[in-house]
Amino acid sequence: MNCSDLFYADTNTENTLHQRTQLSEVILSKGIAKKNELIEFLRQELKEAFDCDVRFWLQGSYKSHTLIKPVDKFSSYDIDIGVYLFFDAENEGVDSKDVKETLRDALLSYCSINNEAKLQESKNACEGLKFSTFLTVDTPIYYKTDTKIKLATDKGWSDSDPKAIQDWITNYYKDKSDRALMKRLVRYFKAWVNVKWQNTGFKKIPSLAINVLVAQHMKQHVREDDCFIYTALSICEELESTLIVRNPLNNSNLISMPQDAECFAHQKLDELKQVCLSCIKSDDIKRGAHFSNLFQHYFPQISLDSATGSTGLPTVVNVPEISVCRYDKNGNHVETIITDRLTVNKGDSLTFTIRNHYDFNIYSSAQWTVRNIGSQANDANDIGHSVTGKPSESHKRGTSYTGSHTMECMILHNGAIIGFKTIHVIVKPARTVRRKTLKFWRA
């Protein structure tokens, strides 16, 4: 197992960390269509409302080509559409709140003719829509003159030039391969944030801050995993004392969050630092285990054989003995087996239970990670998920997509991996129907 190739490899376009972070072409094309439709609607609506030239400029992750797949099928990705009004709003006494409210009314009108869109809760610096197709559109609105650009916020007009910071990010590296590496590293960090902040309620490290950090701290090595490790260590060192990322153009802080969110971010950055330090002197197998835990279902399935002691993980002393209880789509019990690989029909449900859970420390935890592979799962924005519980607790999952998938069970205690098992699940399209062969003679 080459851990670097699990991050990114020219020869592997199907199952790497980089590939698994990228949005499905089907999902992205739907989002682009919605984006274009919304722009054309707002162009006419706002032109009449403000009696001025109205233009649009895409910004954020979509513009910088660092969009990543949402963390699960219940989450969404963002496309940011900057709305520009070409008149001096302040000079004409136009209040920023009135501008935002007019934009919100226009978005509400759009929702009335598009049942896939719902109005988002208003934010200080933008309004937006949430679509049913995994898409969120944020629409910050500005006024622009020959000498200034101001963003409409609830607190007034604010200096802001997203195009300038985007140009800074785009042009930070001149070499094409350096730019490509930077974008990949940004995606890796965003995947890490998605996983570690999921369901916590804490504000995430903003995408713009991640872009600036990666640009300023990117370390180039022959191996892709080393690029991530040493870039992460440099970033962690930068943020260790104070969680501040300065805008390189105006010195403002790109990370602004409540104290509890800041403490949580420091905790996760400390964990990231320790993982990366552990990886420096580790072999590929041990690195793979660390990265599987770090990125969870975004990371490709790794292979460990803890039974033979060849893992390079001396702490792995017990192999989870997992039984799989299988039910068909009608809830009828089909079988209960202990196996490393099984074939099921789409619609079946599987319950995984660690039979020897008593062999593990009573304070350990079991992390169950589902990894879905294939176009059906990819287009449904469901490449997997991770659930943590007690080793004595069973875990149930469905079988919604045809293809080869895995269920990974990782037993953790005090941050150390003390057990590991992978079960491969082959999902067939449907129950096979045997056709009767009718033999007859022709006269």
UniProtKB/Swiss-Prot annotation:
Catalysis performed (reactions): GTP + ATP = 3',3'-cGAMP + 2 diphosphate; UTP + ATP = 3',3'-cUAMP + 2 diphosphate; 2 ATP = 3',3'-c-di-AMP + 2 diphosphate; 2 GTP = 3',3'-c-di-GMP + 2 diphosphate
Annotated site residues (Important for nucleotide discrimination) in this chain: Q59
EC number(s) given by UniProt: 2.7.7.-, 2.7.7.65, 2.7.7.85
Gene Ontology molecular function terms on file: ATP binding; metal ion binding; nucleotidyltransferase activity
One GO BP: defense response to virus
Binding site for ATP 2: N124
Pfam family, one: DncV-like_NTFase
Cofactor: Mg(2+)
S-S pairs: none
Binding site for Mg(2+): D80, D138
Keyword Metal-binding on entry: yes
Annotated active site: D78, D80, D138
Residues reported in the UniProt entry to bind ATP 1: S61, L208
Binding note for cofactor: Binds 1 Mg(2+) ion per subunit.
Keyword annotations from UniProtKB, A to Z: Antiviral defense, ATP-binding, Magnesium, Metal-binding, Nucleotide metabolism, Nucleotide-binding, Nucleotidyltransferase, Transferase
Similarity field: Belongs to the CD-NTase family. B06 subfamily.
Functional description taken from the UniProt entry: Cyclic nucleotide synthase (second messenger synthase) of a CBASS antivirus system. CBASS (cyclic oligonucleotide-based antiphage signaling system) provides immunity against bacteriophages. The CD-NTase protein (CdnB, this protein) synthesizes cyclic nucleotides in response to infection; these serve as specific second messenger signals. The signals activate a diverse range of effectors, leading to bacterial cell death and thus abortive phage infection. The effector protein for this system is membrane protein Cap15. Catalyzes the synthesis of 3',3'-cyclic GMP-AMP (3'3'-cGAMP) from GTP and ATP, a second messenger in cell signal transduction. Also makes cyclic UMP-AMP, cyclic UMP-GMP, cyclic di-AMP and cyclic-di-GMP.
Protein name: Cyclic GMP-AMP synthase
Taxonomic source organism: Escherichia albertii
Gene from which this protein is expressed: cdnB
